[in-house]
């Protein structure tokens, strides 16, 4: 049933729009809404598969990893040994199914986290199936690009007007200095922007290398400039450093190829365009108070050695001998960390919801087996995508597929680097976008068949999803 299939996909695109605008998915209300949208999309997708009898091309390894992670996390929540009482800072013992086996130290937190985690894993499978359609692949790309531009524009507007808080919220008495666009923490905003600006760059490249309408070229070039300028205006130094590295890598990879395909006149136009873009970025920088992030770089040598995140990481490392195969339970870092912090020689003040090191936090919550499976899902997806991209039959992919997968890999490399000293992979909106990109990466292994079917339909007149569209 095309109507059910399309409804599921439109709802998923709605989740991609909603997540970054709803404070990046950092409030309980926004997380619940994201969960409901993903659940609705997944249910409609399953209904469509059952009615049509269609069998999606899902990689077996991805299915195994999804089932294994849902199984481990679900068991840890089901067999929880206690629940954390935040009023008295104590763990209240619970009756559990198998006391001798592993279980979470906080039932409520792990159950809530696994609800979101299971839906995100299903989201990866959903995108694998969606990516087989050329039309929906482009719709997905357009959605990400437009949302990216809107978030970037809001952040730049805040900087230009000297906003003391997100426009529709009241600024606290002590002032707020770490917000950007709809994100309360500039590090998360920077991680999100580094996830999306490579895809806006891809849309700009696609617009200028195909017979696109001049309006589309202007639109996607504007989105690219906005998102890149937003990274520069944001005060997250790590985000700026990663953006610079990614931009250099893209120039080295794509620059020579693009120049070879241009005539002498087109090269001169491209150089003039590059100068115009540079001047535009400079003008945006002046209008959006670019001196603020530049001033933060001047104090980097003083701040980094004394940053509390390094001591927090040492406290977390001291807990590693106790994690076992399956860890303390999904999402339990915030309740486990205080116990180790209070007795550590590296004691750090304050309340820590997340560790500024995603990989170490994952090891604490999921143990050696669980974190290994997450690593295989994330980095394995990137490896699968790179291998698919280099296969001989990948040369027959449509240009949109080759471009989108390449830029998705670049974006995932960026968030993987950011996760070394921050917590982007704990934020719901970033998790959703990473799951989407991983779906594109894992789905690339089946693109050969979908492209072959597409060409067969064009020449043989057979009906299919793309022909109906």
Segments from the language model and where they lie:
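TM-adjacent membrane-interface loops and short helices in multi-pass inner/ER membrane proteins
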Residues: 185, 310-352, 359, 366-373
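Membrane helix-loop boundary segments at the extracytoplasmic
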Residues: 20-26, 232-235, 359, 363-366, ...
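A membrane-periplasm/extracellular boundary helix in multi-pass inner-membrane enzymes
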Residues: 79, 153-162, 170, 228-235, ...
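Transmembrane signal-anchor hairpin modules in multi-pass inner-membrane enzymes, especially those
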Residues: 1-146, 202-221, 248-277, 302-304, ...
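Juxtamembrane membrane-water interface segments that cap and precede transmembrane helices
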Residues: 19-21, 25, 93-107, 169-184, ...
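Membrane-interfacial helix-loop-helix modules of multi-pass inner-membrane proteins that assemble, modify
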Residues: 77-104, 140, 150-191, 225, ...
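Hydrophobic transmembrane alpha-helices and their immediate junctions
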Residues: 368-406
């Amino acid at each position: 049933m095309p109507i059910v299939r399309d409804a599921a996909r439109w709802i998923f695109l709605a989740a991609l729009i909603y997540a970054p605008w709803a404070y990046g998915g950092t409030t309980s209300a926004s997380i619940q809404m994201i969960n409901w949208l993903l659940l609705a999309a997944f249910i409609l997708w399953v209904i469509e598969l059952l009615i049509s009898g269609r069998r999606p091309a899902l990689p077996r390894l991805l299915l195994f990893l999804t089932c294994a992670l849902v199984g481990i996390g679900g068991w840890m929540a089901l067999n929880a040994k206690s629940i954390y009482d935040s009023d008295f800072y104590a763990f209240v013992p619970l009756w559990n199914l198998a006391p001798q086996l592993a279980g979470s130290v906080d039932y409520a937190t792990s159950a809530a986290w696994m609800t979101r985690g299971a839906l995100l894993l299903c989201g990866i499978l959903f995108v694998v199936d969606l990516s087989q359609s050329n039309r929906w692949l482009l719709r997905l790309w357009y959605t990400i690009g437009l949302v990216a531009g809107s978030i970037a524009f809001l952040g730049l507007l805040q900087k230009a007007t000297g906003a003391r808080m997100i426009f529709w919220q009241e600024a606290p008495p002590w002032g707020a200095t770490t917000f950007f666009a709809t994100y309360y923490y500039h590090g998360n905003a920077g991680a999100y922007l580094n996830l999306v600006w490579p895809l806006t760059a891809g849309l700009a490249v696609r617009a200028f290398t195909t017979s696109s309408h001049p309006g589309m070229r202007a639109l996607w070039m504007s989105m690219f400039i906005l998102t890149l300028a937003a990274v520069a205006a944001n005060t997250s130094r790590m985000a700026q450093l990663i953006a610079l590295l990614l931009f250099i890598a893209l120039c080295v990879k794509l620059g020579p190829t693009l120049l070879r395909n241009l005539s002498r006149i087109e090269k001169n136009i491209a150089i003039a365009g590059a100068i115009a873009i540079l001047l535009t970025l400079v003008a945006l920088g002046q209008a959006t108070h670019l001196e603020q992030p530049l001033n933060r770089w001047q104090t980097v040598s003083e701040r980094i050695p004394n940053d509390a995140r390094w001591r927090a990481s040492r406290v977390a490392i001291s807990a590693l001998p106790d994690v076992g195969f399956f860890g303390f339970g999904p999402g339990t870092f915030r309740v486990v960390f205080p116990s180790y912090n209070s007795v550590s020689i590296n004691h750090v003040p304050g309340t820590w919801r997340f560790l500024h090191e995603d990989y170490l936090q994952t090891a604490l919550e999921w143990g050696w087996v669980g974190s290994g499976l997450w690593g295989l899902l994330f980095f394995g997806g990137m490896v699968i995508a790179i291998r698919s991209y280099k296969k001989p039959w990948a040369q027959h992919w449509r240009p949109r597929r080759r471009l989108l997968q390449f830029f998705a890999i670049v974006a995932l490399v960026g968030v993987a680097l950011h996760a070394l000293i921050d917590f982007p992979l704990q934020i719901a909106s970033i998790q959703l976008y990473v799951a989407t990109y991983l779906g594109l990466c894992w789905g690339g292994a089946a693109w050969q068949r979908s492209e072959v079917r597409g060409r067969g339909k064009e020449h043989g007149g057979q009906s299919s999803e793309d022909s109906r569209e």
